[in-house]
């Protein structure tokens, strides 16, 4: 099912929510053309996840799906600004409705130049707190790895990275080489298949 109202999206079975989100990504976020990725690599397609993650219905679907993917005892989700900001917020908000509260943390690329000069925005958590890093799109894996390193340097335990989309260009293998578990809701092939059926 690719057409759900917001009311239905709140309670629809997760398999339907997953198909709905896949349709949103293929319809609104996926573009073909000539692009340069943040990794510096050229590409014939681009996924602008924010065109879905910043929609109310996209955020709700993402929050519901990713919350169910979190390992046990996870107390927080985090991600590198800007792409992960709406994702961690969506998961945290849905977690409150599900009565399984998860804190959202936002990781800066550069330390704030004023005030606390912090790399990590959000509530301060106890050392050893289990945190999962969330990402919109993974290519090489280097962007989310910066978030992992910042969190570990702050004393948090990070073992898992979860992405909405895996471009299948080495990110999974990179995370495995770093001792991290990696999951993605969709592969680029999933999105391209739906895109080409439009």
UniProtKB/Swiss-Prot annotation:
Molecular functions per Gene Ontology: magnesium ion binding; orotate phosphoribosyltransferase activity
Keyword Transferase included in the entry's annotation: yes
Function of the molecule: Catalyzes the transfer of a ribosyl phosphate group from 5-phosphoribose 1-diphosphate to orotate, leading to the formation of orotidine monophosphate (OMP).
UniProt-listed InterPro entries: OPRT, Or_phspho_trans_dom, PRibTrfase_dom, PRTase-like
EC numbers for this chain: 2.4.2.10
UniProt-listed PROSITE patterns: PUR_PYR_PR_TRANSFER
Family named by the database record: Belongs to the purine/pyrimidine phosphoribosyltransferase family. PyrE subfamily.
Protein name: Orotate phosphoribosyltransferase
Entry-linked Gene3D superfamilies: 3.40.50.2020
Subunit structure: Homodimer.
Residue numbers binding orotate: 139, 167
Coiled-coil annotated residue ranges, if any: none
Residues bound to 5-phospho-alpha-D-ribose 1-diphosphate: 108-109, 112, 114, 135-143
Upper taxonomic lineage: Bacteria, Bacillati, Cyanobacteriota, Cyanophyceae, Synechococcales
Enzyme class (EC, first level): transferase
GO BP terms, alphabetized: 'de novo' UMP biosynthetic process; pyrimidine nucleobase biosynthetic process; UMP biosynthetic process
This protein's record includes keyword Magnesium: yes
Membrane-crossing residue ranges in chain numbering: none
Gene that specifies this protein: pyrE
HAMAP family registered for this protein in UniProt: PyrE
Protein keywords: Glycosyltransferase, Magnesium, Pyrimidine biosynthesis, Transferase
Pathway: Pyrimidine metabolism; UMP biosynthesis via de novo pathway; UMP from orotate: step 1/2
